[in-house]
UniProtKB/Swiss-Prot annotation:
Domain of life per record: Bacteria
Cofactor: pyridoxal 5'-phosphate
Binding site residues for (6S)-5,6,7,8-tetrahydrofolate: 118, 122-124, 242
Modified-residue entries (N6-(pyridoxal phosphate)lysine), positions: 226
Oligomer status and interactors: Homodimer.
Protein's gene: glyA
Family recorded in the similarity comment: Belongs to the SHMT family.
Site description Plays an important role in substrate specificity, residues in chain: 225
GO biological-process terms attached to the record: glycine biosynthetic process from serine; tetrahydrofolate interconversion
Record-linked NCBIfam families: PRK00011.1
HAMAP family from the UniProt entry: SHMT
Enzyme class: transferase
Designated name of the protein: Serine hydroxymethyltransferase
Keywords: Amino-acid biosynthesis, Cytoplasm, One-carbon metabolism, Pyridoxal phosphate, Transferase
Amino acid sequence: MAYFLEQSDSEIFELIFEEYKRQNEHLEMIASENYTFPSVMEAMGSILTNKYAEGYPNKRYYGGCEVVDKIESLAIERAKKLFNCQFANVQAHSGSQANNAVYHALLKPYDKILGMDLSCGGHLTHGAKVSLTGKHYQSFSYGVNLDGYIDYEEALKIAQSVKPEIIVCGFSAYPREIDFKKFREIADEVGALLLGDIAHVAGLVVTGEHAHPFPHCHVVSSTTHKTLRGPRGGLILTNDEEIAAKIDKAIFPGTQGGPLMHVIAAKAVGFKENLKPEFKAYAKLVKSNMQVLAKALKEKNHKLVSGGTSNHLLLMDFLDKPYSGKDADIALGNAGITVNKNTIPGETRNPFVTSGIRIGSAALSARGMGAKEFEIIGNKISDILNDINNVSLQLHVKEELKAMANQFPVYQQPIF
């Protein structure tokens, strides 16, 4: 499957194979990661990587784009069908690039952004001070109640006070559904545009397993991987023709040059997979598996942010524990369970240490694991956390879970 690479660069080839083994033998539970479709990888590794195509279909700056025009047009049409919207830009290189392009299109420097606080589950691009958005614009944030749910009343009061030009509703670590209708009411109250960032839940949205951002959001951004299982990339959607034109200009020439045609082809392939009935079954499994995991952890008296989950992820709360999110991340990693440390509401520790971990079900669900496996995993996570310094236990659990993982290969044949 990788003949030329093995011959020309055995060092990189061996490292890729090492990563292939790691992905097969470990339990990938980072909520933002997933296993893409083999067809998507084939498109990404195609000759399309050779083609420059600055501009848009039928309006390029380079010649020889007649084929890639068809490919990008197909990706756009499939995205519009998948998300039931009128306009789509498929050129954004990532979710962050998509968000930055939206701001570039719709805001002026130092305009006001209202987004979810980073420690409550927001993303860096929602106005965090350390990000581009926090430096080029005036950023404000809303948070969650003591119960871990978004405080919509607080969000309204802040919006009324600061009068933002744009409100961002979306997250990178929030275990509940977003009420897009409530956010639109807040936006209308203060005359703001509403950006729905569905990067994490897009796969649930398109299958009816999560509320849809349209018709409430003026513009929607997403990644094309995570719960969609497509290639790494970004996507911008809208039903407003004027906004769509501004978005196109903001992507090119505003924030990007040549689009990645091999990735755009892979996005088109991914969207076709997302439109299949089998993908609906997958999305249901993602949600049901997370419910099983949450139940198993709660039965072992572990504290979860918001008390549970309504989507593909959960957050464990260690505010009252002697160990940190970093400690748990390392211990579970030693046991073959890959998660990530994460800040949580009421955070008291350093962002590089944290008081929580984020766990997702999308990747293991893609391998075909179900309720039985997720109950086992929940019990093993509990065992590790209850004896967090027991290295021998971690190594023992790692071997047990490796045997289980090998029953659910990531891909049915060797593929890089």
